[in-house]
Amino acid sequence: MVGVQLMDNETIDKLLKRFKKKYERAGVLKEFRKRAYYTKPSVDDRLKRARSKRRAQRANEESNA
């Protein structure tokens, strides 16, 4: 669970900014979206391989350019 404490002389805006940063770094929203529906392990593996392949192609294109 992500939480923040209000520090001395801290505005609500700064508190919310710190909370948002911690929330994003913790990956809460990403995990929530991932668990919103079930995907079979075989589908997960296929998507993971496709992402890896695209990443490798981009890296190869950048190194050749």
Swiss-Prot record:
Q: Which GO terms describe its molecular function?
A: structural constituent of ribosome
Query: Where is this chain compositionally biased, Basic residues type?
Result: 48-57
Residues spanning the membrane = none
Keywords for this protein: Ribonucleoprotein, Ribosomal protein
Give an example GO cellular component term for this record: ribonucleoprotein complex
InterPro entries (UniProt xref): Ribosomal_bS21, Ribosomal_bS21_sf
Name the segments for region: Disordered: 43-65
Query: Which biological process annotations from GO are given for this protein?
Result: translation
Q: Which family does it belong to?
A: Belongs to the bacterial ribosomal protein bS21 family.
**What's the protein here called?**
Small ribosomal subunit protein bS21
What species is this protein from? Chloroherpeton thalassium (strain ATCC 35110 / GB-78)
Upper taxonomic classification of the species? Bacteria, Pseudomonadati, Chlorobiota, Chlorobiia, Chlorobiales
